[in-house]
Amino acid sequence: MSNRLSVVMIAKNAADLLPDCLGSVSWADEIIVLDSGSTDNTVELARRLGAQVYTHTDWRGYGIQRQRAQDYATGDWVLMIDTDERVTPELRQAILKVLDAPQRGAIYSIARRNYFLGRFMRHSGWYPDRVLRLYERARYRYNDNLVHESLDSLGAEVIPLTGDLLHLTCRDFAGFQQKQLAYAAAWALERHQKGKKTSMAGIFSHTLGAFLKTLLLRGGVLDGKQGWLLAMVNAQYTFTKYTELWALSHGYSEKESS
């Protein structure tokens, strides 16, 4: 007998993304959507498309919210995805094979193909961009990180799956930038609360390093114009998060008290 699969996702104001996302996983045994306080019709649309919808508006970070969503699942295995991701037919077949004969205790990694300004990137550190997304529900949990959360793998064997997970990372550059700013602020606050600091030299060395790593070490130059642009975006993101950390450590930012 095949194991039951719960597809789990967190959502906020994702009505434009849900139809394609949920359509790509309609074959799952159950779909769990945890809404974070949408003001559009995300909740109604998700229910209409067959998902079980719950709400938690007291946002405490991505890791906690993902685990809250997982706690509603009842399947033997969890496939954790985002609303801007789509499961390809090849990936679906790979997942179904795992459910028929899983390797107990293993976690399965999935290759993401990230979309940036009209192009699915093939280099730049954005492909294959493997993420741990398919695992036994009762065995694994998410950590409590505010941002860049991860599954506590407990040293488990990681097995790569065939097939890609399409990720619409940047359809709208302004919206993408807003999200990057939020991630950078959360990253800096988390590091500051752990007593981490940086210097002016650290800010600029990390910024330059991010640009060169994306463009040269990770082959961004092979992604054409988008590769160059992504290298600059990564440098900007790195500059923002280290500058915010510097500001927090010097008392020049009010984020900590807000």
Swiss-Prot record:
EC number(s) for this protein? 2.4.-.-
> Which GO biological process entries does UniProt record here?
lipopolysaccharide core region biosynthetic process
**Top-level EC class:** transferase
Give the matching SUPFAM superfamilies.
Nucleotide-diphospho-sugar transferases (SSF53448)
Does DNA-binding count among this protein's keywords?
no
Q: Which keywords has UniProt assigned to this entry?
A: Glycosyltransferase, Lipopolysaccharide biosynthesis, Transferase
The Gene Ontology terms for molecular function here are: glycosyltransferase activity
Pathway per its UniProt entry is:
Bacterial outer membrane biogenesis; LPS core biosynthesis
- Coiled-coil segments, which residues? none
The family line of this record is: Belongs to the glycosyltransferase 2 family. WaaE/KdtX subfamily.
Protein name as annotated: Lipopolysaccharide core biosynthesis glycosyltransferase WaaE
Q: What is the lineage of its organism?
A: Bacteria, Pseudomonadati, Pseudomonadota, Gammaproteobacteria, Enterobacterales
Q: Which gene encodes it?
A: waaE
